[in-house]
Amino acid sequence: SSSELKWAVESINKAFDTIPDKELKDDISSVFSDVISGDEVNWPVNEMIEKIKEFSPDRLIGMINSIDNQLERISFDIAKNERLNALSDDVDAQNALNKVLEVYNRNRGHMSEIGPDVYKDMLRAVPIWVTTAQSPQSILLEPKIFDLLVIDEATQCSLTNLLPLIYRAKRIAVIGDQEQLPAIPTISVEAEKALAQKYKVDDWLELLGHAQNDVYKTAVQCLPRRFTDIIGLNEHYRSHPLIIGFSNQHIYNKRLKLRKDPAHEKKIPIGNGIFGQNVEGYCERGKWNRSWVNKPEADKVCELIADLRAQCTKGMFGHLTMGVVTPFRAQEEYIQEKLENMGLLEKVKVGTAHTFQGDEKDIMIFSPVVSKGITENAARWVENPHNLINVSITRAKESLFFVGDMQACASQSGILGKFVNYVRTVQKLRDTSKEELDLFSWMVIEGFNPETHVVIKDVEVDFVLTHEGLRLVVEVDGKQHDQAKTQDKSRDVFLQQLGYKVLRVPARSVRETPASVIHDIRTQLEYN
């Protein structure tokens, strides 16, 4: 159609204008000039494809990945060779290493027989040690024997447990995420306060206390400018943007830079992103009147796993990993028992959010349990604080399934209610239009917060975006737009009279040139 031709010519012109190299531009122009000017009726398609095949996104990404892999391999080879060459001339370090290994194996990890001089000689051969906070006995108890101690998952660590390792280091680097699960204290707040008052150290509780503290909080308090001095590791590569997009919006305040490209994701049979399955279940107490279980919801989870295993565990998808996360231990145990009886428990990890802290799976199922019968306090506990929900939904790399009572969960006033409404939004877009869902994904990556299917004075629009007082309506035009141009123009004028800008985006542009669409949206919203 004429509109498709116009779109194609405009897209080619935009792409042509971005070519920086004049010689290359002239070469491509030899084939594209008539097309760009609009004079060519019969396009030389084969010649055009040949000229630009080196610039296809897949080819460019493949070349970049190949260069990255080569650089990584070369870097490791150089470092390895330099290390081996240096070690081959250091006889004292080799002898010390042999002696330490002998003592380590004989004494089951204890190093009490090793003197500081031998240990320091050994460190020249093995300068990097990886250990847990519970295993410092494998390292010589001497001050400052390590130049740097790196503490990972610092919000899970108490200062008390880390003191033996901190004692051994000159400097420490603390890595953590305060939006993840906190450490579980071994003393109550009241007991700790009583001890602090008894020994007159009340003023140190905020900095060095155990019950309401962790290594990350203490480290922040030690920085000269507190939170201002934190170095943010904000680039996120793990999760599909529709999954991490919720947490970025509602928990991380848009600080994350989403780097996983939905156009080049690992395609899996059941689809990528977020899915919702509604189950009107009921809650009851677990064994010995502890915890909570929602059996109809758990049964639906097991059915879903059976379907997923049938679709995603054969051929090229046989390596996909799966997990089920739930807030309640009784629900975890019920699901595990049922999956075992069905012969499906193998290669499916089931647990609470604490089980999955620091872990990830290709496919995750979130079973919130909240439904009729649960107490108000138990339902509130699921979402307050928000860390439990955040960990539960961000373990998924490719696909996240919410299986639960959507109405009951949506009625919650905190993060659970917001998440269910987000799931509903994505599910509605998935059922309506692939291009709308794709554009929503790209807008989420950009950090936008689009309202979807908004009704403005009886006129329903696809998306509404706001920025510094500007209001932009974005409409994704499919084939039906060609038959309703006059009506659409009338709608646009009506919306403009109400103070909205209107941007119409061809569905084909969303499929083929999403970056250009996002650029147009940013321009309309007057982003710098």
Where are these regions (language model features)?
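Conserved helicase/translocase motor-coupling segment
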Residues: 254-337
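Short beta-strand-loop-alpha-helix junction that forms the active-site gateway
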Residues: 455-493, 497, 506-512, 523-525
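Conserved nucleotide-binding/hydrolysis micro-motifs of P-loop NTPases
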Residues: 135-136, 155, 178-182, 188-190, ...
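Helicase C-terminal subdomain and adjacent C-terminal extension
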Residues: 188-231, 340, 373-454
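Conserved helicase NTPase catalytic core signature
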Residues: 2-145
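ASCE P-loop NTPase helicase motor core
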Residues: 109-252
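Conserved helicase C-terminal RecA-like lobe
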Residues: 307-394, 405-411, 419
